[in-house]
Amino acid sequence: MRSLASDTPLMRQYHAIRAQHPDAVLFFRLGDFYEMFDSDALHVSTLLGLTLTKRNGTPMCGVPVHTARTHIARLLKHGKKVALCEQVSHPVPGELTQRKVIEIISPGTAVEDDFLSQGFSQYLATVCASDATVAFSYLEVSTGAFFITSFPRAEAADALQKEFGRVQPSEVLLSASVLRSLPELAAILSLYPRLVRTTGADALFNPEHTKNRLHHCFRTRNLDCLTLLPHSPDLAAAGALIAYLEETTRHPLSHVSAITRYHIHDFVEIDDATRKNLEILQNLHDSTHAHSLFETLNYTHTAMGTRLLRYWLHHPLRSQEEIQKRLSAVVFFHHRPHILKTLRATLSCVRDVERLVARVALEKAHGRDLLALKESLRAILTFRSLERESPFPPDLLPSEGDTPVLQELYGLLEQSIKEDCPVTLSDGNLIKRGFSASLDELHRVRDNANEILKQYLAEERERTGIGTLKMKYNRMLGHFLEVSKGHLSAVPAHFIRRRSLSNADRFTTEQLSELEAKLARAREGLVSFEQELFADIRRTVCSHTQLLRTNAARVAQLDVLQSFAHAALQHGWSQPVFIKDGALRITGGRHPVVELHLPSGEFVPNDLTLSSSEHAVLPRFALITGPNMAGKSTFLRQTALICLIAQVGSFVPAEKAELTPVDRIFCRVGAADNLARGESTFLVEMSETAHILRAATRDSLVIMDEVGRGTATEDGLSIAQAVSEYLLHHVRAKTLFATHYHELSRLAHPQLEHLKLDVLETDNTIVFLKKVTPGSCGSSYGIYVARLAGLPESVLARACELLKQLQQRAGSAPRASAAHEADAVAQTEAVHAHKAASKPCAQRVSADLFTQEELIGAEIASLNPDAITPLEALTLIARWKRSLRGSATQQSSAMTKRKG
């Protein structure tokens, strides 16, 4: 290998190319390897676990060309960019091979499956600003989806934070000037440490430059049709994205055919804290989609549908008309389960048409991509047959005008592409026999050459007398003759030895070399012609890019709507009814996720009625008290989720739900330290609370849990009451406010309702009923919950003593519930060990609604038999017998009175 000293021509070439791409890892092609040098080698070898070597003091590492895609994908997941530098001239001895970067791959510019996550969008976003307006735009090059919005400069900080949280781009393209003019942007970006940031030259955002790029991309001189506002940052934002992507992909973006303009107020505003607390797309435990709302709703069968479902969950609708359009389609499928079943089976045959079409347009599609497109077209064409039984809702199936074109494309791909074609185009074997007469002729020549090789082998067998003489082929030697060790003495002089093995030797001859050269020329001609035909087929498909993208979008929407219908059938959900009186009425509401992970029938449904109207007799503020573990947080979250699910356009987990669309959903439930930003739990809690008080409107839904818990009791109580009063008197939003500050129960207002989570106390046992009823709860039963958590009995006893002392100092007698707790500690021999928690949800409502037998049954259901001793079990049985005898006596007495 030539010297790698920095003054060699090769290294000068490397450094010159590297300087053009300072923010990317340069994959520098050297023969069958991509090499990395200097700082790239040091960094990548550590990141990917590659072997680091040195040549003439220069650090280097490399990966084979055939495994490079795997390593590039790993780098992208680490948030890196890769500049792919290829050899663009044939190597000539003594001359430096020409090289250039043919593509820049980054999380926001990737288009090939190896570099993408199925079901996830990977957007490239940008921000541009003028003195009065800020534009936010994002584009997914792998599908062609392109969006833009703008807002007044004064609203930029809040609006940008919401949009970055909602869109969650993979990469952001910014100019240095916008970072200077929007100092708040740096703080927003710091919230997303994994977001790849690319700094573009200010010239990239120049209005004239971007306008020309847009004219070229959309093939129009009139940009009004693109919904871009003249004399605004819109042009710079949209044009910069197009320009940057054309530079990185080294190809026109013919599949990007429209820009969707939206207004941020078209959708329900959900901030990052609320999105996290409601576990909409990922859970709080390990940040996966397990046990999330997304998992509960996701019965999609296509990658396109999965991405659209994520988008819809990030963008709940505010328009009743738009929500109703979706609901009408869900109702259609919900009421026709036989059609739904057939539709779901057909959708399972549809591949990722959006990304397939993008690769076709960017000339990156291979034979198997076109086969996947063919199978998808076949499935899409069968959708129309489902309409024979019942007309589908509009805009979900291919139009009658599109059908002939789709059939024509399907026919072209069916006739042309071989089912077993390879991924690599240079391997050939792409096109079916019979598609092209010229190609068939080349096949005939190649096949004849094979016959000639067979004839030559027969002649050599006869000439040498070696009946076991074989002809084989590999990439290293080409065609060769193989002679076993036992026949080497019969090898003639014109055999030229190529390789010796343990059991055979390999030879060639001048005649075989000539025949092989003829075969190679025929094969090269055939592969070259196949590639030309394939390129023609791909161009034909590309000419219908817009039609294919339109129908792919319809399929994605169809997939999500059928997913909603299937979820409703699976989970027993009902159709929400939208009203305009500002009310929220939920009957038998359930938590969509918690319910599914409990045994069937165990979740306790609850009702709720709220209104934001000033003149309504209905409450708009519900103050909720109840013990720990009683189900307050579940009730709070399920209310928010029911509203969100309804405004996405789905059925909801309730017997009945009537609601007026909300404009914002806030959910402040729990908090944690933000150590990286130097913020304590209480500061995080207060920051979230302040945001809600500033941003909530009368049309919002506010969920707040345990405000003020992170500081001293007096401070926390004061803050909780002040926040409650502000929400009630000034914000006037529909509010659920859960608290352990039972002193707040004295609050009164015509539109304030006190709700509590019921608790059943029987002798020495406490059962959390999970049922929401009017009234206030006098205790949090903290010591009882501490017992369930397994605190030592001595600690529990001491806690009861201290509780009594604290209450006596406060000048009040211990509450009845506190006495029960102390009594429970004192009677440890008569009570089972509460080390194992009761079932999280039990189907019980209130003590006065149950017979003694049912109450005992509830207590038995809450027991963990592995956690009680035989003596404790006998004690329990004795108590139950006494209770049953007492119950029988009461019933007998009641019967006697009635007869009398």
From Swiss-Prot:
GO biological process: one example? mismatch repair
InterPro entries given in the database record: DNA_mismatch_repair_MutS (IPR005748), DNA_mismatch_repair_MutS-lik_N (IPR007695), DNA_mismatch_repair_MutS/MSH (IPR017261), DNA_mismatch_repair_MutS_C (IPR000432), DNA_mismatch_repair_MutS_clamp (IPR007861), DNA_mismatch_repair_MutS_core (IPR007696), DNA_mismatch_repair_MutS_N (IPR016151), DNA_mismatch_repair_MutS_sf (IPR036187)
Question: GO cellular-component terms in the record?
Answer: cytosol
Organism domain of life: Bacteria
Q: Where does ATP bind?
A: G626, P627, N628, M629, A630, G631, K632, S633
Tell me which Pfam families the record gives.
Answer: MutS_I, MutS_II, MutS_III, MutS_IV, MutS_V
Q: SUPFAM superfamilies from the entry?
A: DNA repair protein MutS, domain I, DNA repair protein MutS, domain II, DNA repair protein MutS, domain III, P-loop containing nucleoside triphosphate hydrolases
Any S-S bridges, and between which cysteines?
none
GO terms for molecular function, please?
Answer: ATP binding; ATP-dependent DNA damage sensor activity; damaged DNA binding; mismatched DNA binding
| Swiss-Prot/TrEMBL keywords | ATP-binding, DNA damage, DNA repair, DNA-binding, Nucleotide-binding
Function (record text): This protein is involved in the repair of mismatches in DNA. It is possible that it carries out the mismatch recognition step. This protein has a weak ATPase activity.
Q: Would you identify the family this protein belongs to, as annotated?
A: Belongs to the DNA mismatch repair MutS family.
- Name of the protein described by the UniProt record: DNA mismatch repair protein MutS
Source organism per entry reads: Treponema pallidum (strain Nichols)
Q: Which gene encodes it?
A: mutS
